[in-house]
C-alpha cells in the first residue's frame, strides 16, 4: 500500500513549513536545491472560506527551466499549518513525460493548464479551485474580500484528471453545489467559459477548506458567478494515463475444467 501512495511515488517532494520556509527532497529523501526554481509563498483572501489563505506557489515553467521537474512525473507538495494551500502558476505547458501533482492541501490552479503540447496530467488535492487567466492581470490577490464584480474572469482551459473532495452539505436545503461545483470558483465568470477536458473523481469530502458553497451574485456573502461550462472526458486517458496513476487488477471467477 505504501508504494501506491503518490508521496512515495514522487521524484520531487516540496514542503513549506508554517512560516513559509521551502525545502525539497527526492524519492530517496535526498535534499534537492530548488532555490532557483521560483517556489515561494504568498497570501490572498478566499471569500468562500472567509479567510486569508497562504499558498506555496509552484511556478511550473520555472520548475522545468531550473531542471528540477520530477523525472518520473509525480510531484508532491505539502504546506503545514492552518489556512495553508498550494497554487500552480505558469502551467500552460507541462513536462513532456506527463505530470501529476498531489497534495494533502487544497490546490489553486491559476490560468490555463496543460494547453500547450498537451500531455497526460492529473491533480489530486483536498479541493481544487480554478483562478482564471485574468486573476493575475487583475491583481485579484488584493481583491479577494471585495464584491464579485471586482474579480472578473476570462476564458480559461484546463486539461487534467482531478481527484478532489466536494464540500460537506451546506445549510439545510442548499446542498453543496453538486458535480458542476465540485470544481470551485472565486470570480465573476458571467459570459465567460471554463473549458475542462479530463476526468473527475470525488472520493471524500474536503477536510481543510470548509467554507460552504454559496451561489451566486455580487452582494452579501456571495463569492462568484458561474462560468459557461464546456466540460468533456479526455480520450487521451484511453491510451495514456497520468504518471503515478494507481492501476488495479480485476480477477473474475469463471469456469474451470480438467481435460
Regions found by a protein language model. Give the residues of each.
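C-terminal globular interaction/adhesion domains in large, modular proteins
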Residues: 1-259
